């Protein structure tokens, strides 16, 4: 597995469609689709499945400054930095826009205070991208900004949340006067809600690909359906036969849609 990762990294395929100047492979959408098809055909896993590559990186390419791109993107493409997401809070429930973690401007820094919860991998992450409130007087969707926070900063406390299984995939993170450079603001001040929505679009896109790329059994349903139908020819199996054919047709239509998206 290590050799596989190293070879994919050396080919710049950790982020195959990112610009070459930021460590990516420079592939256009059509060539990216070909690469994904070949990985699937060879039953190879995606080289990198993480928040940096699939979610934050595309947002930095769209909203980040040139300095931010140069600082944060190349380490992602080399697999050197781990990221976590600081969105959910203890008192907000599903109303994310009511978040209360504050970021007060002070000189060349923001001073961050508050807490995040259900943060996957925070105990191992190097950095967090966090939604914070930079204008408490503004309407709740308009006073939010997105900051990149170094998890080694003084004032950060990470507490793993032990699940009933004994695992601790999630954490609670506390910020006590954490100083974050102004240069780590992504997008405009108080414009973080729009940036976050864009980031979550990339999350949905990434999740939709995970099963398609990582489950070899789903490489091609058509031959499997044909074998199934050959062995289930009894009239009583008609409903099952129709369902199996519908699944194969849906998968084929999905791949045609991806091909069209690549061409566009």
Regions found by a protein language model. Give the residues of each.
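Glycine-rich phosphate/pyrophosphate-binding beta-alpha loops
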Residues: 93, 117-122, 164-165
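Active-site-adjacent elements of ketosynthase-type condensing enzymes
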Residues: 91-99
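Short Ser/Thr-interspersed hydrophobic loop/turn segments at strand-loop and sheet-helix junctions
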Residues: 12, 35-40, 131-132, 148-153, ...
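Buried hydrophobic positions in well-ordered alpha/beta secondary-structure cores of metabolic enzymes
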Residues: 12, 19, 35, 65, ...
């Amino acid at each position: 597995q290590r050799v596989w990762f190293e070879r994919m990294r050396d080919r710049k395929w950790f982020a195959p469609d990112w610009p070459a100047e930021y460590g990516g492979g420079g592939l256009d959408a059509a060539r990216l689709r070909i690469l994904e098809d070949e990985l699937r055909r060879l039953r190879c896993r995606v080289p990198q499945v993480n928040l940096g590559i699939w979610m934050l990186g595309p947002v930095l390419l769209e909203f980040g400054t040139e300095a931010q791109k140069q600082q944060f993107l190349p380490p992602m493409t080399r697999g050197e930095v781990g990221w976590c997401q600081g969105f959910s809070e203890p008192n907000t429930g599903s109303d994310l826009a009511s978040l209360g973690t504050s970021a007060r401007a002070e000189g060349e820094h923001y001073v961050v205070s508050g807490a995040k919860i259900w943060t996957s991998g925070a105990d191992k992450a190097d950095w967090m991208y966090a939604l914070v409130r930079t204008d408490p007087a503004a309407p709740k969707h308009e006073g939010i900004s997105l900051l990149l926070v170094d998890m080694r900063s003084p004032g950060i406390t990470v507490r793993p949340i032990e699940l009933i299984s004994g695992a601790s995939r999630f954490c609670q993170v506390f910020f006590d006067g954490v100083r974050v450079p102004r240069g780590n603001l992504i997008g405009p001040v108080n414009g973080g809600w729009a940036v976050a929505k864009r980031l979550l679009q990339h999350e949905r896109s990434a999740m939709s690909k995970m099963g398609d790329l990582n489950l070899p059994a789903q490489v091609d349903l058509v031959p499997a359906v044909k074998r199934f139908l050959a062995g289930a020819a009894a009239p009583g199996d008609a409903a099952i036969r129709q369902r199996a054919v519908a699944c194969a047709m849906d998968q084929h239509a999905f791949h045609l849609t991806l091909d069209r998206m690549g061409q566009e």
